[in-house]
């Protein structure tokens, strides 16, 4: 892919490359009920594809346990490259691991005590690893890796009906989205729109405020 091509073109032959997808259990990107399909994607053929043609969902960091694994690998790699700084890197990792464990526990307590285990996104959905980690079900306008931004009337109608049928009080959108799909659903259902931050992008204002994965 493009990352491999950039890495191969680097003049730094000592550069270490860490592939996050190779460190954790990964999931294929999926098309759920009501979801707008990828360009050229035929949902009827889903059961016929194999690993060679699968598209992996790359948003592995949305599960805090995966974030711990990835952070540990980064710390280990830095410690090997700069042995004198080993204690510094590993010390920082231990502090960060504690923050991630605390975050994971907060999520588990919140979800264990929630009235519902279902979320609806009027947007793309790059959070499969998150919902798998915490036993949530979801419905969304698009899968996480699509470039599509305009859902069909059928998809919007499905999500509106789902909100009404399941008495969902909140529609989620993701950071830096215009939120138009979620707003349309909310207007038709009397619900409110909230932003779910996927730690994929960050606004200039949030960056300057020091917002992080665990904040």
Label for each model-derived stretch:
Residues 1-215:
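Extracytoplasmic metal-acquisition and chelation regions
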């Amino acid at each position: 892919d493009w990352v491999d091509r950039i890495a191969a073109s680097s003049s730094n032959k000592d550069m270490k490359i860490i592939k996050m997808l190779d460190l954790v259990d990964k999931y294929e990107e999926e098309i759920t009920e009501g979801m707008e399909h990828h360009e050229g994607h035929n949902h009827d053929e889903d059961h016929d594809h194999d690993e060679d043609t699968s598209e992996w969902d790359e948003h592995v960091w949305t599960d805090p346990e995966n974030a711990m694994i990835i952070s540990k690998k980064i710390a280990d790699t830095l410690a090997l490259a700069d042995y004198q700084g080993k204690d510094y890197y590993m010390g920082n990792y231990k502090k960060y691991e504690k923050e991630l464990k605390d975050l994971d526990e907060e999520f588990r307590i919140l979800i264990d005590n929630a009235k519902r285990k279902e979320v609806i996104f009027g947007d793309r959905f790059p959070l499969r690893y998150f919902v798998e980690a915490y036993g949530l079900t979801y419905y969304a306008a698009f899968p996480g890796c699509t470039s599509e931004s305009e859902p069909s009337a059928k998809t919007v109608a499905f999500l509106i009906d789902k909100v009404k049928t399941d008495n969902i009080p909140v529609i989620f959108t993701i950071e830096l989205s215009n939120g138009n799909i979620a707003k349309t659903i909310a207007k038709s259902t009397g619900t409110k729109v909230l932003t779910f931050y996927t730690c994929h992008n960050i606004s200039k204002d949030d960056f300057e405020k020091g917002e992080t994965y665990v904040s």
